[in-house]
UniProtKB/Swiss-Prot annotation:
Name under which the protein is recorded: Interleukin enhancer-binding factor 3 homolog
Family matches, as Pfam families: dsrm, DZF_C, DZF_N
Annotated organism of origin: Danio rerio
Biased composition, class Polar residues, residue ranges: 775-818
GO cellular component: cytoplasm; nucleolus
Compositional bias annotation for Basic and acidic residues: 373-385
GO molecular function, one term: double-stranded RNA binding
SUPFAM superfamilies for this protein: dsRNA-binding domain-like
Domain spans labelled DZF: 11-379
Biased composition (Gly residues): 640-651
Residue ranges constituting the DRBM domain according to the UniProt record: 402-471, 527-593
InterPro entries in UniProt: dsRBD_dom, DSRM1_ILF3, DZF_dom, DZF_dom_C, DZF_dom_N, NT_sf
Taxonomic lineage: Eukaryota, Metazoa, Chordata, Craniata, Vertebrata
Length: 833
């Protein structure tokens, strides 16, 4: 089984990935530079630990002297003071900035640490720590020389080394008490504690505390996000090269990248992630009327880009739009400031050890914060569980690859029971959508399962056997969560790989373990249809409502509800589309259990009210389309006319209107208006095209003239395009305007072609926000949704129809007002599903 599509870079972004990774390797620090940084940081941390011990010994010695000088009455007063001395003056040292986040680039020479103090840091403490730190560094490190200088104005200690490159390490002194005091003042409380006269600048201490929060947030949210750190490094280099981008440098850039990449519904490669960030900026998020960037590390609502003025915001937005155009037309190397790569790169030998680009410097093991020393004395292995948790957290976005684990079920069963004989029981369904049923006998017990291929059916059989034996199947443990959620028995959850289950009833009773085996396929009714589409045929105008949304960003659970005749049906899934399908499936099985194929066929056999242009002499008596006829593709030809020489509808695959002749819907001209009447088939909710516009292929530009293609000569098609999955042959003359496939149900309130009622033109005026979907499920075609979940007025990235992108709220296509850049209605979004 091939690797899961979710973790493969989209094919259209492969070139971008190559350029981004090539640029990243060029700006990434060398191993020598990283070793120099690591040595300086670790030396300083160890020296600060010795300084903390020295201060602790001094304070304990003073406490003992005070205790000896006092009498019995005074002992009661000294007990609290000795208790306070048990806590060190220096609480710990933490890495912040580029070192903590792993964002170092070539030439970055400034490193930062934060030294936490028990009390508010003072000038006296700063000088004492600085003097002793120089002594400890000389004793600790003999091969290198460090210059230590206190900077009272900035509340820091600056350390410089004498080697090349000349690194500068800044230690910021601060204390949590500084922020607590500010919060109390803001709440109107009176402060009883009087600060010492030589206390350090409060604002500098607050800034150091903020940098500490930023580092912790980044490690929790951005480090585990695929491609996020790489994109931030690329954009840091862009901010250094292009002055327009410099106001975004630092914390705002990190927030923006995490927000743009983290809201995606799947892991993305570096090229796609960079384009998503550029789209986010180009949409106007920085503009005065945009959504802005909220600082998640502040209790009060704080704008992280408040320091950027209006002109700078406009300049950055314009630059991002220009960069987005360049990347869309294959000129990403100009944005990155590099030469274009050759089309074929020589493969590097894989013997080289791969570089871990996420973690530049390993975490500190020499310095342990003093406040946690008692715990460490009890158990030295106490840190191991935390490390494991962090590793699991970092892996969590990549753990969405459940299908990769599912393929191990067959291997696992073969290891446990070698020599099993899998038998093909039956093969049903049409030639283009076969359904295989395989069986295997294990310990005298027979197991059966179905799938679109023999290999997939064998996998399903193996899953059932392992479940019956009570062994893990290799799937993720999401099934346990499914059992906890109160949902109808008929609901199942779909996982990314496209494995179609047999719609016929299986003799084995359906149990929660059966649900596990059926998890991998699309959600279909007993007729092999999308449940939402079939329910819409029976009851129109249904409204689906989102009841609840639970789980973290990597494991969402949605509950959708639909009400029919006073009865409410709920469905649960990993996204709204899946939950909606489950709700529709529950309603169908409850309200329409007697639905049969014969009824559907009767409805489909109704003759069309109007014959389209593609119908030369009406439908033939043979109801089945020619399986080997040409023009059966799904309109992938970008304007090329497919002549359906052998089919019954002479307009390409006639009812789709994709072919060279004018049949069905023709949206290439006059703004998406069909120009003819439409007959609505009440039985199947499918509209058949009337007199279509005679324009043929419309112009790419806004003009009244258009090119009308003559009937092309029969042209051999090199490859037989796949037919629709799990759909039956269409009745003659009945247009497929109702739905382009079983997976055309979009999110939200997007309308389908088939929902137009009446006879006044199915899509007159080009209105509505139509959602294009391929006939196959999205997991087969590799299509993935590419829209923003966190930004308003965000359009979808258009890969097939040209540059039909919208930035902000402008719904017009790239070049023209009403004529779309690609084929179809200009408001028709070609999006990844």
């Amino acid at each position: 089984m091939p690797p899961p599509l979710r973790h493969r870079s989209m094919r259209i972004f492969v070139n971008d990935d190559r350029h981004v990774m090539a640029k990243h390797s060029a700006i990434y620090p060398t191993q020598e530079e990283l070793e120099g940084v690591q040595n300086m940081v670790s030396h300083t941390e160890r020296a600060l630990k010795l300084v903390s011990d020295w201060l602790d010994d001094q304070e304990k010695g003073n406490a003992k002297v005070n205790a000896l000088d006092t009498d019995g009455e005074g002992d009661k007063e000294t007990e609290p003071s000795t208790g306070e001395q048990a806590t060190r003056s220096l609480r710990g040292v933490m890495r912040v900035g580029l070192v903590a986040k792993g964002l170092l680039l070539k030439g970055d020479l400034d490193l930062e640490l934060v030294l936490l103090c028990k009390e508010k840091p003072t000038i006296t403490l700063l000088k004492k720590v600085s003097d002793n730190l120089a002594v400890q560094l000389k004793q600790l490190v003999t091969e290198e020389k460090y210059d230590v200088k206190p900077c009272i104005r900035d509340a820091t200690i600056v350390i410089k080394n004498a080697k090349e490159p000349p690194l500068t390490l800044t230690i910021h002194l601060t204390s949590p008490l500084v922020r607590e005091e500010v919060e109390k003042q803001a709440a109107g409380e009176t402060l009883s504690v009087i600060d010492p006269p030589d206390v350090l600048d409060r604002q500098k201490c607050l800034t150091a505390l903020a940098s500490l929060r930023h580092a912790k947030w980044f490690q929790a949210r951005a480090n585990g996000l695929r491609s996020c750190v790489i994109v931030i490094r690329i954009l840091r280099d862009l901010c250094a090269r292009v002055p327009t981008w410099s106001p975004l440098r630092g914390w705002p850039l990190e927030l923006l990248c995490e927000k743009a990449i983290g809201t995606g519904n799947r892991p993305m490669g570096a090229g796609e992630a960079l384009r998503r960030v550029l789209e986010c900026l180009a949409s106007g998020i920085l503009m005065a009327d945009g959504s802005g960037i909220c600082d998640p590390c502040e209790k009060e609502l704080t704008d992280a880009i408040s320091h950027v003025d209006r002109q700078q915001r406009e300049d950055i937005t314009q630059s991002a739009q220009h960069a987005l155009r360049l990347s869309a037309f294959g000129q990403l190397h100009k944005v990155l400031g590099m030469d274009p790569l050759p089309s074929k790169m020589p493969r590097k030998p894989r013997s080289d050890t791969p570089i871990d680009y996420t973690v530049q410097i390993p975490p500190s093991t020499t310095y342990v914060p003093p406040m946690k020393r008692p715990i460490e004395e009890e158990s030295t292995d106490e840190k191991n569980p935390n490390k494991k948790k962090k590793k699991l957290q970092k892996k969590s976005p990549d753990e969405k690859a459940e299908p990769a684990q599912a393929m191990n079920a067959l291997m696992r069963l073969n290891q446990l029971k070698p020599g099993l004989q899998y038998k093909l029981i039956s093969q049903t369904g049409p030639v283009h959508v076969p359904v295989f049923t395989m069986s295997v006998e294990v310990d005298g017990k027979n197991f059966e399962a179905s799938g679109p291929s023999k290999r997939t059916a064998k996998l399903h059989v193996a899953v059932k056997v392992l479940q019956d034996m009570g062994l893990p199947t290799g799937m993720d443990q999401k099934t346990t969560e499914l059992m906890k959620v109160d949902e109808p028995v008929s609901t199942q959850e779909t996982l990314p790989p496209v494995i179609k289950m047999e719609p016929e009833p299986v003799p084995i009773t359906e149990t929660p373990t059966d649900e596990n085996a059926r998890q991998q396929g699309p959600i279909l009714t007993k007729h092999g249809k999308n449940p939402v589409m079939e329910l819409n045929e029976k009851r129109r105008g249904l409204k689906y409502e989102l009841i609840s949304e639970t789980g973290g960003s990597h494991d969402k659970r949605f509950v959708m509800e639909v009400e029919i005749d006073g009865q409410k049906f709920q469905g649960t899934g990993s996204n709204k589309k899946v939950a909606k399908a489950y709700a529709a499936l529950a309603a169908l099985e409850k309200l329409f259990p007697e639905g049969s194929n014969s009824e559907v066929n009767k409805k489909k056999k109704m003759p069309p009210m109007h014959t389209g242009f593609g119908m030369v002499s009406g439908p033939p008596s043979d109801m089945m389309p020619n399986p080997r006829g040409r023009g059966r593709g799904r309109g992938r030809g970008r304007g090329r006319g497919f002549n359906n020489g052998g089919g019954f509808n002479q307009g390409g695959y006639g009812t789709y209107g994709y072919g060279g002749n004018n049949s069905g819907y023709n949206f290439y001209n006059n703004g998406g208006s069909n120009g003819g009447s439409v007959a609505s088939n009440q039985g199947t909710n499918q509209s058949s095209g009337g007199a279509a516009a005679t324009g043929g292929f419309g112009s790419y530009y806004q003009s009244d003239s258009s090119y009308t293609s003559p009937a092309p000569t029969p042209k051999p098609v090199g490859k037989k395009p796949p037919m629709h999955q799990n759909t039956k042959p269409q009745a003659p003359g009945v247009g497929q305007g109702g739905s382009y496939g079983q997976y055309n149900q979009g999110y939200g309130q997007k309308k389908n072609f088939g929902q137009t009622q009446g006879g006044g033109g199915a899509a007159a005026g080009g209105g509505g926000n139509f959602n294009y979907s391929t006939a196959y499920p999205s997991q087969v075609t590799g299509g993935q949704e590419y829209n923003y979940e966190g930004y308003s007025n965000q359009s979808n990235y258009n890969s097939q129809g040209g540059a039909n992108q919208n930035f902000g709220g402008n719904s017009a296509p790239y070049n023209s007002g009403q004529a779309g850049y690609g084929r179809g209605d200009p408001n028709m979004n070609y999006q990844y599903r």
